[in-house]
Amino acid sequence: MYKLTDLYKQLKEESTEAPQSQYKIYCDMDGVLVDFDKGYQELTGKPTHHADVQGKNEFWGTFKQSLQDKKISEKDYWANLQWMPDGKELWDHIKQYKPTLLSAPSRDPQSRWGKRIWVKKHIPNTPLILAAAEAKKNYANKNAILIDDRISNINDWNAAGGIGILHTSTATTLDKLSKYGI
């Protein structure tokens, strides 16, 4: 026969609420969950590192011209990007902590719609904040973790008092998160 305390314990174990954590997780999209580099290379025929050589204006100019040549809207480009090869694994681990996506839109406002569509298709009901890269740091605090693939965003986040985790692979990110009990 069940005691009331046994039933309470069982119900508590079955709870679907997020595990208690003292940390708020913010996760970037491009280069962490979403494979922007692969999408860019498939679209333009050029690797994304050419931005470092040619400059951002030519990088985005090539992007826009390729979209026009292939008759693809910027909204559709962003909405149809693929997961990073290990992006789902990372998401499956952090989703229980109710993370917020913190992503920088491109120069074209249509990227905002495309990113929202991607989230709705792949991870519905996930909060999404679209902020310029230099504004991400405004969400930092001592209990806020940012997972991002850009060192400049991590440095800004850390300088603003947050905990930045430079994402190079899911394995290394999960290892770093484990140090915070996540």
Language model feature labels by segment:
Residues 19-70, 159, 169:
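Active-site neighborhood of HAD-like aspartate-dependent phosphohydrolases
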Residues 33, 37, 84-87, 111-116, ...:
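A structural signal for well-ordered alpha-helical scaffolds and beta->alpha junctions
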Residues 145-179:
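Acidic, Mg2+-coordinating phosphoryl-transfer loop and its flanking beta/alpha structural elements
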Residues 71-101, 108-113:
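Short, acidic loop-to-helix structural element flanking the phosphoryl-transfer center
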Residues 1-25, 32, 48-50, 58, ...:
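Charge-dense, intrinsically disordered terminal/linker segments
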